[in-house]
């Protein structure tokens, strides 16, 4: 399914309320922080961990200011929420759906293809 019209509407609505909003889901897996030698250092409390998804919606002024600061500092971020938070902003997270996957890696694309094929939808290629 990926992103739904309902998710898009809800995140846009929250962005008007909070200036910055994104979609996410609670993490189901146990997450480990490991050291450089691949040994576990700690286990964060899963109840506070969320996998952030898209869409991520921001007030233009807030986003552009954060982007300018990142350029000046030559910083790179894995998503736009990190860009905002590292520039002092707060991003409201609302619950999305586990089928709303990010297409970041080749494996993600293959998984999405499988999801569509299992639902009888085939628009690839």
What name fits each language-model region?
Residues 90, 97, 114:
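Glycine-rich phosphate/pyrophosphate-binding loop and the adjoining helix
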Residues 1-2, 100:
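A short, conserved beta-strand element in the Rossmann-like catalytic core
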Residues 2-94, 125:
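Conserved core of the sugar-phosphate nucleotidyltransferase
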Residues 100-125:
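Hydrophobic helical membrane-anchoring modules
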């Amino acid at each position: 399914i990926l992103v739904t019209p309902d998710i898009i509407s809800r995140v846009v609505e929250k962005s008007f309320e909070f200036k910055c909003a994104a979609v996410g889901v609670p993490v189901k897996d146990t997450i480990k922080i490991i050291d450089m030698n691949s040994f576990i250092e700690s286990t964060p409390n899963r109840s506070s961990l969320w996998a952030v998804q898209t869409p991520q919606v921001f007030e233009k002024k807030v986003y552009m200011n954060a982007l300018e600061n990142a350029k000046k500092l030559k910083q790179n971020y894995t998503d736009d929420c990190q860009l905002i938070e590292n520039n002092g902003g707060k991003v409201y997270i609302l619950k999305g759906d586990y089928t709303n996957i990010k297409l970041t890696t080749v494996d993600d694309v293959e998984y999405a293809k499988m999801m569509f094929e299992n639902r009888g939808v085939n628009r690839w290629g």
